[in-house]
């Protein structure tokens, strides 16, 4: 069962269709919803986009190729704003303090995480960073 019942329609319908396609891909290991939909503050449809963090194996190195590879899954809809990372890139993003990813993991909603990648990543944030207001500060290790 997907954890998306809290998402308002028609966003939920679009999210459900896209998530269904994503989890059918063998390389997709985790999906996180973040941004206004995850926070329960979407603008009227279609002003908000559906922000997703997708963790997958075997992604193209080139960011443009990466986006083009999965573009057909969107059926031409521009409502999806997704970030695709490998598990290793996710670790590097946390260690390096990529604010968007730190915020996504802290305030987002885990939609699909059978391998506990997002769960482990969320716990790792506090190992490396402290949040002061809206700013992430790297801890001295």
What are these regions (language model features)?
Residues 1-27, 38-46, 57-141:
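Catalytic core of pol beta-like nucleotidyltransferases
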């Amino acid at each position: 069962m997907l954890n998306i019942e809290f998402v308002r329609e028609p966003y939920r319908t679009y999210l459900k269709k896209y998530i269904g396609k994503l989890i059918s891909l063998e390389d997709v290991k985790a999906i996180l919803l973040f941004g206004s939909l995850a926070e329960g503050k979407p603008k009227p449809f279609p002003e908000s986009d559906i922000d997703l963090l997708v963790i997958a194996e075997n992604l193209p190195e080139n960011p443009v190729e990466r986006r083009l590879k999965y573009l057909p899954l969107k059926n031409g809809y521009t409502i999806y704003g997704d970030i695709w990372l490998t598990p290793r890139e996710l670790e590097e993003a946390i260690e390096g303090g990529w604010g968007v990813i730190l915020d996504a993991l802290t305030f987002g909603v885990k939609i699909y995480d059978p391998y506990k990648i997002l769960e482990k990543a969320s716990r790792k944030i506090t190992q490396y960073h402290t949040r002061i207001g809206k700013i992430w500060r790297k801890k001295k290790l």
